[in-house]
Structures are given as C-alpha cells and as structure tokens.
C-alpha cells in the first residue's frame, strides 16, 4: 500500500482518484475483458528478436573528477537534525502464535496441516509441500512439468478445463529441497478441487512433448550458463563454501537427462511425494473438515522424515586464492571468504546480524558501500553473503561469510586490497552501529507474514526445529545487544580470522605475481567444477 501511494505521488495522481478507479474493478464483466482484448490485441504489433553477441569495446579516457571531502562524511544537515527530533512511536514486534493465528492438525505419519482464517473473502490458498533432498534429479527443468501434466483419464487440456470450470488455479515447483503444489480458488469449490488434485497425484500422465522440451531447456541452460556473470558468481561462492555439496552440482548430468523417457518423468513425480508433507491453508474451511478432505492425499504412509540439506562449510587449510576465468568479461567480481564460529544461540546470531548490517549488508550505510563506492568510486556493487544453517539442530556448525564487489578488471586488486584492509581495520562509528541494530529490528517488523503466508511460515519454522515464531527470540536478543558487544565480536572473531580470496573475470588482465601477497595456494575453477 505504501509503494502504491508513493507511485501515485510520483506520477501526480491523487490517492482518492486511484481508489475510485480500482473500486470499479468488481463491476467488470467477461464481455468487457473480451472487448478490450479484441480491440487492442489485433494484427498491428511489433515483434522483437533477441540476438546474443557482444559489441566492440570503446576506448575512452577517464573523465576528471574532484575527490570527495571525507572530513564531514557523518555531518548532518540542519533539516536532518530537526527531523531526528520528531517524536516517533516505538513499534512492538508482532509474532505468529501456533494455536492463535495458526491452527495445526496432524494428518498422519510425517504429515501435518497448518491453517489460518481468511478475514477478507472466500478465496482459499492450499499448498502441499513434500520435503526431501532430490539430488541427482533434473531439478532445473522439472518445474515446467506442471504445464504439461494430466491424469490417466484426463489429458492436460481436459484437466485444465475442469480446474477452470471450478475457478481454481494450480501451480507447482520442483527443487532440490522437494516439491510443492499450490491450489487457489473459491472455498465452495475446495472439495472438487482436491479430488482433481488427488487424481493428478495418484495417476500422473505427461507426454513426449514435455520430455523434448525439458531436454532442450537443459541444453540451452548448459550453453548459456557461462554467459551469465551473476550465475557464475553464485556457483563459485557455493563451490568455495560447500564443496561437492554446492547446489549447482546436485542436478542430474545432461548426459543422463538425455536418456529420460515419459515413464521416468512420471516416476520422478510420484517419488517426490514420499517426502515429509506439510499442508498450508488460508481460507474459511474448518481445520478438521479440511483434514477429512485431504485423507485421500495423506493415506499413503511411506513418507520419510526430513532434516534439511546436510552440509558443512569448507575451511581452507591455508589462505587460498580461488579464480574463475571469464575471458570476455568487462568487469570482475572479487571478495574474501572467512569461516566464522557457529551461531548456536540467538545472542550470537544477533551479534553477527548487526555486524554484517554495519559492515556489508546495510546498503548505503554499510562500511563497504561508503568506502568502496561513495568515497572512491571503485565498485558498481558490493555486499556480503553468509552461509548459515537454518535447522536448529545444525546451528552448532561453523558458518561461511563472503564479501563481494563488482568492479572494473583493472581495479580488481585495488578493490580486493581495500576490502582486506577494512576487515583488518574496520572504521567504527557508534551512530552507524545503532542504525545497523535498528535495521535488524526493522527487518523483523517488516517480515511479519500476511495471513495467507502465516501457515507456511510456521510450517517451515516447526520443520526447522522451532516450537514458536523464531523471530521472537531473535528480536529479544537484538534489542539487548550493545555497540560494545558488536565491536568485541568483530575483534574476537573477524578482525584477525584467516581469509581466503576469490576473483571472477578476465584472468589475463590480473597480475598473478601481485596475487601472491594474499596466499600461495591457488585453485582455478573450470565450468565443470561449478556447474552440472
């Protein structure tokens, strides 16, 4: 709502006029929509074709600029000082409670239901999530299956037509951590919608067209992976932190995917239903009535427990330099990698969260952004990324922390040197530390899920080992954390911690001799090391 208000203000639209405009939406009829489509979607259109390639680089001289004066970087204008004196209410965080906002029911072995009431209308949303690790499966391409799936008695078109007659939509997702299917429609058509879903789950049918499409998408994915700098960046970080457990390495090899037939795909769809099941629902059907409707889906008792993705961050024995060559890259991505102690209490998690906000993840207010971009114009982007454990039982494992920065290739080593020095000698500003703490609290306040997302939120929390909203304990810990504690955490665990380094870009333009100051061990990744 705030975003809509801001958009109206920016375009000079009166908010009341906007409200009056959207209030006419319920009066629209199907004929109105059809008439608009027939009027605008005619034979007069532009057709765009996309062609991959690269332009010849222009050689331009660096424009002159005046250095930024840094002696008053924390000075505030009179307006900002006056604004800070304005009284503002203190927000009390709102948390989700099982038994209050969210009702639960046990559906059977490894199957649970989470529901919440819909106070606004009679539209439901039902999500079934089967949780299991699906390594060595075609996880990058299976999600498209839901556009080609029918049953043994209903073709895809016939199945979709029956859903449409009920006013119900179906979508699905197939990923490394499991499979999910979401239904949305009218509460009075929930029962027939679930019957159709049951038929789909028990008697899935697809065709050769999907298999051909899936194989084509896999080939294109392999072809274009090396062209996407951000995809390479993520895959390299995963490989450094997770080794052979890196997400990109869990997909089915293309050579094996080529041999898949229709029966194999249907078998994978059925096998995905053997994971731990959580069902999330928002609507006006009572939990007990819904549990009864779901019996045909939950009667199979061969589901397995789920303990999350099992990995431990890799700790290099010596400071290591990780390299990935992208010969046609105009820019480079550089950064550091550090293994930090476990975040096995809310207090430790609060310390790391506040420090990370302050140093790398506080957007315009972070140390990295100010030092690398504001004051020196060295980078295009910068930030931090943490590899933490989500399941409570695994919180006793160390975490991995990266700094990252995108810069010009000829500035790569300068940028890396500056990041390294900032980690060793971090500038400390009490006001910015307070802002980092407030940002952590703002994230909790702003992340409270809407009613439709509350069942899924609590289902995930319970799955990860929590008995209540995990943000409740986090908020308490963040509020009780002091600047002195954050500084001590940095000095004890980060300031002198062993670091490794990475560079992604055109390695021919990198001075290998100068790199030796960061470490003697060099690991140079190839495409097959980070992508399958």
PLM regions with names:
Residues 1-25, 46-51, 61, 120-147, ...:
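M16 family metallopeptidases and their MPP-like homologs
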Residues 8, 16-132, 136, 266, ...:
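Proteolytic maturation boundary segments
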Residues 257-260, 265:
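Alpha-helical scaffold elements lining the catalytic groove of polysaccharide deacetylases
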């Amino acid at each position: 709502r705030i975003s809509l208000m801001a958009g109206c203000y920016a375009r000079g639209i009166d908010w009341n006029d906007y409200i009056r405009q959207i209030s006419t939406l319920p009066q629209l009829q199907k004929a109105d929509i059809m008439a608009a489509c027939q009027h605008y979607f005619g034979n007069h259109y532009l057709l765009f074709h996309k062609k991959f390639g690269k332009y010849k680089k222009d050689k331009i001289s660096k424009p002159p600029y005046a250095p930024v004066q840094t002696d008053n970087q924390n000075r505030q204008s009179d307006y900002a000082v006056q604004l800070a004196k304005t009284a503002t209410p203190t927000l009390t965080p709102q948390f989700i409670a099982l038994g209050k906002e969210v009702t639960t029911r046990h559906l059977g072995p490894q199957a649970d239901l989470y529901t919440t009431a819909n106070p606004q209308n009679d539209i439901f949303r039902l999500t079934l999530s089967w949780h299991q690790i699906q390594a060595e499966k075609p996880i990058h391409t299976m999600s498209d299956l839901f556009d080609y799936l029918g049953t043994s008695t209903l073709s895809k078109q016939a199945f979709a037509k029956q859903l449409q007659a009920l006013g119900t939509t179906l979508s699905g997702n197939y990923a490394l951590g499991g499979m999910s299917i979401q239904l949305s429609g009218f509460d009075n058509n929930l029962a027939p919608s679930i019957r159709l879903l049951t038929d789909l789950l028990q008697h899935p049918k697809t065709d050769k067209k999907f298999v051909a499409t899936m194989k084509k998408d896999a080939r294109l994915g392999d072809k274009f992976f090396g062209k996407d700098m951000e995809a390479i960046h993520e895959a390299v970080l995963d490989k450094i932190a997770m080794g052979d457990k890196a997400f990109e390495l869990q997909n089915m090899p293309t050579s094996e995917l080529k041999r898949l037939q229709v029966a194999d795909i249907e078998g994978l769809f059925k096998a995905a239903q053997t994971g731990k099941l959580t069902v999330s629902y928002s609507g006006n059907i009572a939990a007990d009535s819904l549990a009864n409707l779901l019996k045909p889906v939950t009667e199979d008792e061969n589901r397995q427990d789920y303990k999350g993705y099992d990995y431990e961050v890799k700790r290099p024995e010596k400071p290591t330099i990780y390299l990935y060559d992208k010969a046609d890259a105009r820019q480079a991505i550089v950064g550091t990698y550090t293994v930090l102690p476990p975040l096995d209490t809310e207090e430790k998690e609060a310390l790391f969260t506040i420090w990370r906000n302050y140093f790398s993840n506080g957007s315009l207010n972070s140390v990295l952004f100010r030092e690398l971009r504001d004051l020196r114009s060295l980078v295009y982007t910068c930030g931090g990324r943490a590899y933490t454990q989500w399941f409570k039982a695994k919180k006793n494992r160390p975490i991995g922390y990266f700094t990252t920065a995108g810069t010009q290739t000829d500035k790569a080593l300068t940028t890396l040197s500056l990041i390294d020095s900032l980690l060793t000698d971090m500038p400390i500003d009490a006001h910015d530390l307070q802002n980092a703490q407030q940002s952590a609290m703002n994230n909790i306040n702003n992340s409270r899920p809407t009613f439709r997302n509350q069942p899924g939120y609590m289902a995930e929390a319970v799955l990860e080992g929590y008995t209540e909203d995990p943000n409740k304990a986090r908020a308490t810990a963040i509020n009780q954390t002091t600047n002195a504690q954050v500084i001590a955490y940095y000095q004890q665990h980060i300031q002198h911690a062993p670091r490794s380094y990475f560079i992604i870009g055109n390695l021919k333009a990198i001075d290998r001799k100068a790199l030796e100051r960061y470490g003697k061990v060099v690991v140079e990744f190839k495409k097959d090391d980070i992508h399958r």
